[in-house]
Amino acid sequence: MVYIGLSNHMKSSLSQVLKMELQQNGWRNPKKAQSTVGHCLDRLVWIAVVMMLWVCKVDLHAQPEIRVDVLLNAQSNASFWMHPRVGMVPHDQDHPMAVMTLQETDREGTHMYHGLSTMVWDSRDKKWSSPQRDSALARRVDAQGLIEVFVDATPSWHSKTGKILLTGATFWLDPQLKKHLPDGGSDVAYSVLDLQNLAWSPWSKLELPSEPKFHFARAGCTQRVDLPDGDILLPIYFGGKGNDSRHKAAVARCRFDGNVLSYLEHGNELSIEVVRGFVEPSLCLFQGRYLLTLRNDLKPYVAWSMDGLHFSKPQVWRFDDGSELESYNTQQHWLVLPDACYLLYTRRGLDNDDIFRHRSPLMMSRVDSTTLQLMKSTERQVLPKLKDGFGNFGVCQVSENETWVTAGRLRAKPGEGSVYRARILW
């Protein structure tokens, strides 16, 4: 018999079943053998179905149910909400809950962020609290009236300490210019949530080596990986002069004791001589390899590593038909399941030439972990096409059967949806 597409182990198993049936049911008798073969084929069909389902269990994730809702509407002519990202207190804890940080942003000016706000989803009543500002995450004003603000933040559960650790970056803003300082510095910033009081610690700065290249250093909009010993692999990017300088990306190994985040080392520095270089890197661990996706002004890139610190030369993101992803100047993030890995992104070619930087709809595709290409046939829309688009979004694994993707709608007007959530049900 020929078993198309089955492993040697499966072929052997099917052959053994057929042999046993023929031996037990009289294969020497032609009439009986004819009946036995039919019976065997029935058995083989069922076994083949089970084995095919086992082989294709990853493909069962290809068409999840996606439900989109609006968590917040814009309420002011002066501002809208951006950078909504969720950290999940796991269900094996006494009080599982989701904690979202988000940021009110002035409609006038560029990067005119206010202090971070927090919303909490209680697993008992399944409701969200209204956004609350915390003085610990507020803007800080220096003697010259310049504003330093904690931005681009991502909350994530740290299992070793049982804390939600919020990581991001700082921006220096000039209220007179209504924009960030062109040559202003930046630091990797963090805060820790007290789960009992739902209060954040005053935001602090990660101490990096005293080198000029770290004058502008950030962990903005990044996804990190926590190691079994509690150490953290935190993607960062840095450039000497400011936001508009050329940046390099690397992964920093940090230690977190539940209160203080400390730098230990960082791996090889990834660079590209194209516009602002590599920014907003996000990291994941899938099937024993660390994958790093990188934003660039013109194209997105991906690199891999076995130790989470030393990465391959970045390659342009492509689909498995060889075509480029056609995303640009916008972050990408990972969605990782035990047996499948997805990339979330925005791109050209979706009847969206009227959208700023083609930042909607928000899409996802499964990653071929061997080639590091995206499987075009698995591409799905996660969030719809909307005027002005998304771009600044987060991904949170709520449970083994549910993933949330949260995004802020650029320049939403009063009454319009400002914070969107996609519930991906596996």
What kind of region is each of these model predictions?
Residues S7, S12-S15, S35:
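Serine residues within intrinsically disordered or low-complexity segments
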Residues H83-R85, D152-T154, C221-Q223, E280-S282, ...:
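Conserved beta-strand position repeated once per blade in WD40 beta-propeller domains
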